[in-house]
Curated annotation (Swiss-Prot):
The keyword Nucleus applies. One of its GO terms (cellular component) is nucleus. This is Retrotransposon Gag-like protein 3. May function as a transcriptional regulator. Plays a role in postnatal myogenesis, may be involved in the regulation of satellite cells self-renewal. It comes from Mus musculus. It holds the Pfam family zf-CCHC. Keywords: Coiled coil, Metal-binding, Nucleus, Zinc, Zinc-finger. Residues 58-73, 474-483 have a biased composition (Low complexity). RTL3 is one of at least 11 genes called Mar or Mart related to long terminal repeat retrotransposons. They do not correspond to functional retrotransposons, but rather to neofunctionalized retrotransposons genes.
Length: 553
């Protein structure tokens, strides 16, 4: 590897020396051609309005008079570029493209054999070979490479292999003076596309295309711009113009459109005045904001309507605490909300209702369910129990004073049991003591019934038994009061009398039987599973309630 690099380095040095000699020759020729510049300027002025002004014309190869201008501008740049040696690592790349261009471009030399074309060919060869050298020197001389391409191309083309192409490069630079604006626009695209042009220079047809783009990118174009491009010699090379135009047209849209996209929004041409721009901005912004606000408002209004529709039934109390006078109103709102929503089971419905009770009402709600387990599965009974419990708020003050002041009196057993259970939660008393205290304050009629049964050691069992006995007593009264219905010939009432007689003569359960039914979750009244004694269908008051419900419907 090192030997190859050293050999390539030596060859490049020799080539640089040859180029220097060629540069001197070209400088002498430039001096001779400078005398012809005024004549060429006149002819170029005539052709300024012709279609050859395109950047492709600047890239046209055969124009002998352009060499002097290019040489003059390139003279200061060429000697330092040629003198500077390229690194061995960089030498490999230039050798290959230079060799390729040398081998591929001899046929082009045959076509234009004129002396000026040879000068231009020197430039083209210099372009191809020196491209390799500047690529070698890319890190050291990236800015100088642009300036040195012109001078190196002039000598290289004469001796190397691309005399016609050198004419193109020289011819392009001087005519660029007249087309300064067009060339400046083209400079951006070819300058950035130099790496793309270098590989194209190796191909026979594309060599001219890549070289003119490189020559346009060099700053020498602006300095050497002169009307020499319009000489009649350009007609011979005008055939190559379409090729240059194709390459330039293909390369320009790649680079120019992105800057145009960025410039259009930044520099709007319509609002030139600052006042116009401000008015334009003020008008555009509020329009968008108004549309956004309208959409946002309509969306929020719809959302609010939906929320109001869902929360409307619970406007007044989201949670029922201590204002017991509003219980009926709260229950109406709650039932209307639950009907629209619906729940799969009664137990889920009851648990949901319990979430609305807080404060003192919440403290009494759970004992109510504990004292009467059937309420957990029947929502209608729960509502009646709530009304019975919270219908007399003055009794809460008595309940807060303690168990001694709590009496059932003429009230219902569920209400008394609920308040007793609420107070018992705050006392550290045993189950047996609570059972005794509960039974002592019951109504006399219920106490007589309980005395016939075995004593219970669980407060919940005592409460259930007490409620059951009270329901039995109320059921007997209801059955007697409904005797008028029995006389009307309804079949239901005679069947109801049988359980009533059975209940009056029904013996009390033993403690063992009662324990067995509790363990097996059986009804304490009929002994069948699936319901509690309060909901037993065998009871006469249950049959009467079913008849009343049908009558209401």
């Amino acid at each position: 590897m090192v030997e190859d690099l050293a050999a390539s380095y030596v060859t490049l040095k020799l080539e640089n020396e040859i180029l220097q000699a060629q540069v001197k020759r070209l400088m002498e020729e430039n001096a001779a051609l400078q005398a012809q510049i005024p004549e060429l300027q006149k002819s170029g002025a005539v052709k300024e309005h012709e279609p050859l002004r395109k950047p492709s014309e600047a890239q046209e190869p055969p124009e002998s008079p352009e060499f002097p201008a290019a040489r003059e501008s390139q003279n200061p740049w060429e000697p330092p570029a040629t003198t500077e040696p390229g690194e061995p690592t960089k030498i490999r790349e230039p050798r290959e493209p230079s060799a390729i261009s040398e081998l591929r471009e001899p046929p082009e030399i045959k076509e234009p054999q004129e002396p000026p074309e040879t000068n231009e060919s020197g430039e083209s060869s210099a372009i191809t070979e020196f491209r390799g050298s500047p690529e070698i020197k890319e890190p050291h001389l990236p800015p100088k490479s642009k300036e040195y391409w012109g001078p190196q191309e002039l000598p290289m083309v004469k001796e190397s292999w691309e005399p016609p192409e050198a004419l193109d490069s020289t011819a392009w630079k001087p005519p660029a003076v007249k087309e300064s604006q067009e060339i400046q626009k083209a400079l951006e695209s070819p300058a950035t596309q130099r790496p793309q042009a270098s590989p194209r220079g190796y191909d026979l047809p594309a060599v001219c295309e890549a070289e003119p783009t490189d020559n346009q990118g060099t700053p020498a174009l602006k300095e050497l711009q002169s009307p020499q491009l319009h000489n009649p010699t350009n007609d011979e090379e005008s055939q190559t113009v379409p090729e240059y135009q194709e390459t330039s047209s293909q390369l320009e849209p790649l680079e120019h459109p992105p800057p145009q996209e960025t410039l259009e929004p930044r520099v709007p041409q319509e609002p030139l005045d600052p006042s116009d721009a401000e008015e334009f901005l003020e008008l555009s912004v509020p329009e968008e904001s108004l549309e956004g606000l309208i959409v946002a408002r309509t969306g929020t209004e719809q959302a609010q309507c939906e929320l109001e529709a869902t929360t409307l039934p619970l406007e007044y109390p989201l949670a029922f605490s201590e204002d017991f006078q509003k219980l009926s109103e709260f229950l109406v709102q709650l039932t209307s909300y639950l009907r629209s929503r619906g729940y799969p089971t009664e137990a889920a419905l009851v648990s949901f209702v319990g979430s609305f009770f807080s404060g003192e009402a919440g403290r009494m709600f759970q004992p109510l369910l504990d004292s009467q387990p059937p309420l957990v599965e029947q929502f209608e009974r729960l509502l009646r129990a709530l009304q019975d419990t919270f219908d007399n708020p003055e009794s809460l003050e008595v309940a807060n004073q303690g168990l001694p002041q709590l009496r059932q009196g003429e009230g219902l057993a569920p209400r008394y049991s609920t308040r007793f259970h609420l107070i018992a939660q705050e006392l550290d008393l045993g189950e047996s003591t609570l059972c005794i205290q509960f039974q002592e304050e019951l109504a006399s009629s219920i106490q007589n019934e309980l005395s016939c049964t075995s004593p219970a050691t669980n407060l919940s069992d005592v409460i259930i038994e007490c409620v059951t006995l009270e329901e039995k007593a109320s059921g007997g009264v209801d059955s007697s009061s409904s005797s008028s219905e029995e006389e009307n010939g309804s079949e239901g009432p005679p069947t109801e009398n049988q359980p009533v007689q059975a209940t009056s003569n029904r013996p009390h359960l033993s403690e063992a039987e009662r324990a067995r039914r509790r363990e097996g979750h059986l009804c304490l009244y009929c002994g069948h599973p699936g319901h509690f004694a309060r909901d037993c269908p065998v009871k006469p008051h249950r049959v009467q309630q079913a008849g009343n419900m049908e009558a209401r419907r």
